[in-house]
Amino acid sequence: MDVNGPKRWEPHRSLDLNPRSTPVYKSPLQEPCGVFGNKGTTKMSGVVIDMGTGICKMGFAGQTRPTYIVRNIVGCQPKRRTTMEQPKMEMFIGEAAHARPELTLMHPVRNGIVVDWEAAEFIWRHILENDLRLDTQDHPLLFTDPPFNPASNREKLVEVAFESLHSPAIYVASQSVLSVYANGRVNGLVVDTGHGVSYTVPVFQGYNLPSGIQRMDLAGHYLTKFLAEKILRSSFAVKKEDMDTMENIKQQYCYVALDFQKEQGRPDEKFRRCLKLPDGQMITVGKELFQCPELLFHPPDTSGPSSLGLPSMVEHSLSTVPQELRADMEQNVLLCGGSSLFTGFEGRFKTELLRRLGPEAHVVVVAQANRNLSVWIGGSILASLCAFQTRWVLREQYEEHGPDIVLRKCS
């Protein structure tokens, strides 16, 4: 793949907006345009940046998947001094940082929200300039925006994009709205469970319905820690290399039980299996493999604003939706995020949801195979549309109105 990406939308490249046979409402999304080219702007492809808690996804608008998927960490250490000058920091991102035990690691995002802007900017700049090899002055940037993101964070983002990255234009788009677009819809109830946070958001005609948003500070990272403590039988802090191993075990072997109590009641020996760790030692795992993702359905009381579990969160979100929209939402329940990829998740989720809503509910649960990329794909679709090109926040508008312009144009 050419790391520089296409400079213009190529007509033979297409995005599948309807990958499933599930009924889809006709979308107002128009044919892709793929260039940023209104008065006073450049004719270069936009870049979509989805900054999750665990992973940063980045690539060109109009592509079907991100060009770079990078672990969202920065590692630093002082450079060796050869003169009496002040020591400078040597910095790495992603796997390059994670593989160096001598580095001090920084995690720029916590529970979906950027908390370290210096580290976040370093990741963006590194991928844009060193990996994609582009001049940020020539490319508009579309950033994704999580639920409950403070307005001050959006303003800071605009400031970094214009003042530091020198982008000609930016846009900040709701993650849940982008997930709806990725599913070929403009209406839907998004159920997103990723690395740091889970939430449910009803979306109507491309806008969030704020009163229906439910959030739970329990997602993939919490599950990995739970699995580590269960398997290692320790309440002490787990080492970094242990967490890596547990993450791999979680992704390869954990599953969601269709009937948790029935599974729990089966003899322990039915579940025992021995796994060899990277250091050569053997460990035994068992019921932890389905107890781990069960927390998404029955979380502990310490999991943040909502301790309801995902199906109950959907029920609460639906209860806030105007009655005339409820059937539309029930028929467009969209699973998104990497922590929804467990084997058995989709079936159990739908069973639990139907049990709560009753037999009269006509629930349609949509679970695309690439749903861990839903937010980025939605951003790629949006930023490539001709009808969208007038919605970019331009540098001239920022210079005239200041960073609060994003609150007006990106609502």
UniProtKB/Swiss-Prot annotation:
Lipid biosynthesis is among the record's keywords: no
A GO biological process held by the record: acrosome assembly
SMART domains, per database record: ACTIN (SM00268)
Compartments, record wording: Cytoplasmic vesicle, Secretory vesicle, Acrosome; Cytoplasm, Cytoskeleton, Perinuclear theca
Residue numbers spanned by region Disordered: 1-23
The protein, known as: Actin-like protein 9
Subunit structure: Interacts with ACTL7A.
Compositionally biased tracts (Basic and acidic residues): 1-15
Domain of life: Eukaryota
PANTHER family: ACTIN
GO CC terms: acrosomal vesicle; actin cytoskeleton; perinuclear theca; sperm head
Similarity annotation: Belongs to the actin family.
Reported function: Testis-specic protein that plays an important role in fusion of proacrosomal vesicles and perinuclear theca formation.
InterPro entries from the UniProt entry: Actin, ATPase_NBD
Record keywords: Cytoplasm, Cytoplasmic vesicle, Cytoskeleton, Fertilization
